Amino acid sequence: MADTTIKRNVALLKNKIGSLILKQIKGMIGEFIAELIANSFLRIDENTQKLTSCVNELEEADIWKRPNPHSNSVGNIILHLCGNFRQYAIASLGNSNDVRERDKEFSADGGYSKSELLKKLTDTLEEAKRIIQNTSGEELLRKRKVQGYTHSGIGIIIHVTEHYSYHTGQIIFWTKQLKDKDLGFYAGIDLNAKNEA
């Protein structure tokens, strides 16, 4: 009888400890996901500010200029960013139909003004961020096919963030080429400051 009681108490204690550990792990995972999303949104917002600044520097005619036949205009890149966010974040994470027509993003040679492109981008980003923010933990871990690749929801967040940064860099480079000026993104910031613990 005493052996059975001891075994039952040990099992209860293990279950209680296991539950506490599981609760801590779930809490840490929740914190990790919240931190990942917050930092992704920070990068997305930073890139939006830079991209908007570039578009505002350019003339309407500059928006559809291509550096060469093998490169895209700022207008094409913005349409491409909208398509990518729509396919990956809005359709995939939002569990809606994928209606992207990728080739049209690159074949366009006009049709949108600077302000229309920025509005289209801003609206797309706000919808994507809302969906990302409301995506469940299960959906963030679930694997799915997007554009022929297999991604988890977390992988999708990383992809749209880095993809946006990559193309924002192209827009910055092309704007500097066209305008021959420093865009002042880091004005007043000491980028030589050393790390602190």
Task: Give the residues covered by each predicted segment.
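Ala/Thr-enriched low-complexity intrinsically disordered regions
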Residues: 2-5, 11
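Active-site rim elements
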Residues: 34-41, 111-115
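Acidic/histidine-rich alpha-helical segments that form the ligand environment
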Residues: 109-145, 154-166
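Short, contiguous alpha-helical
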Residues: 13, 18, 22-30, 41-45, ...
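Surface-exposed helix-capping loop/turn segments at secondary-structure junctions
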Residues: 57-64, 131-141, 178-182
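A generic alpha-helix structural signal
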Residues: 55, 78, 118-121
